[in-house]
């Protein structure tokens, strides 16, 4: 089982490049960043943790672009994986997004993982022309179309939301298969979607007790005829040795901790303390 760090990037505090370099130097496997293109002032969508239209803090309206952030991180690191937790592909043109991700994987020598979400902020999605009730189908088509562009010499796709004829698109990713993980609640509906269209699950802050959901996902994964086991990235706040040992036995592949978006010195102090605690859990 590995450990990763997620930075809620914003226009203040430590930069993504400095944060990724810090994470790599302390042995973390993956560096994650989130995505919000904008936050409509007038909204009806409830935030998953507040239960209403209020936001936990103002970082949501200050979020940096994830692919630019990971590109900067790529330039100053050599080993750590670069990922999103989570990106919102349906808010972009799929052909252009496929190019951005393939370019990042090419320049980072195959270090990209893509964490995606269906999008809790449906008001944000609507501004991008996304019908909220169709966002799952739209995301599935986007992923299928992008995989075609990443893997086929002459790619094409004919769906409800994505259509393009035979096309050339290079560079191809260094990885033969870029991992796609879905950040969503641990429900049967979501797990069936993951088993069909993704490679694993990122838990949410509300998924505190994950023992039963992990087993459910693994059962659905096997029933769908998928090989091996799904990747499972579990969010955590404080490392507890017994809990981490149990998660490893369950099949959790990576535990993800949040990095404070404060000054570089404050972030470094936090990462050093966390790395020391995790070393005691080995």
UniProtKB/Swiss-Prot annotation:
GO terms for molecular function: oxidoreductase activity, acting on paired donors, with incorporation or reduction of molecular oxygen. InterPro entries: Diverse_substr_monoxygenases, Lucif-like_OxRdtase_Rv2161c, Luciferase-like_dom, Luciferase-like_sf. It comes from the Bacteria. To M.tuberculosis Rv2161c and Rv3079c. NCBIfam families: F420_Rv2161c. This is Uncharacterized protein Mb0978c. It comes from Mycobacterium bovis (strain ATCC BAA-935 / AF2122/97). The lineage of its organism: Bacteria, Bacillati, Actinomycetota, Actinomycetes, Mycobacteriales.
